């Protein structure tokens, strides 16, 4: 049986990230207490992960990001202020993402090569963002090949591919940007069941997670 290679990632954000950014300072941050617990668990099982970090927290808690980095985990971008890219202007998107890259690179001293959109919010309505990302990162992990009331591009590839500039759900090997879709499980030969993400991990039966 071929060896199964799993890619683990963490969206580094807090419980209030879905609220308006202007109100974030009104809430208690929990990432300072919970992150060491997660790092200890990863260390126990010798697991390395990619942390998609909201830039706000890197700016506020740079030492915490350095601790993640020192444990051998990759630091990637999850925007600066956890914006929904479908509901934000092009100017604000470019400003927010550029700020996230700058903050993360200043904190880590390393080039950021990965990005994941909050709410998996890249779809046909704003696929131009991939062209913007090509100038900054090597891979994206925002296109969730599922049908959901909240997000998703159900006809997008389930496997790693290179998004074409003509059609973002088609593979073009000549493109350098790599798309790493969040994990799905194909059922009934016609439906992609979302598996990646904390909600699905908690809600789905164990046999689906295990497979």
Give names to the regions the model predicted.
Residues 1-74, 116:
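Active-site beta->alpha N-cap acidic-glycine motif
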Residues 8-14, 78-80, 181-185:
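Short loop/turn segments at strand-loop or loop-helix junctions that form parts
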Residues 19-23, 86-87, 191-193:
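Short acidic, glycine/proline-rich loop/turn micro-motifs
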Residues 23-30, 88-95, 197-199:
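Alpha-helix N-cap and loop-to-helix initiation/capping positions
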Residues 25-27, 68-70, 93-96, 131-134, ...:
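Short, hinge-like loop/turn segments at secondary-structure boundaries
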Residues 31-35, 61, 93, 97, ...:
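Aromatic/hydrophobic pocket-lining residues that form the small-molecule binding cavity
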Residues 45-126, 138, 142-151, 175, ...:
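Metal-dependent polysaccharide deacetylase catalytic core of the NodB/CE4 family, i.e.
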Residues 110, 117-211:
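Active-site-adjacent pocket scaffolds in enzyme catalytic domains
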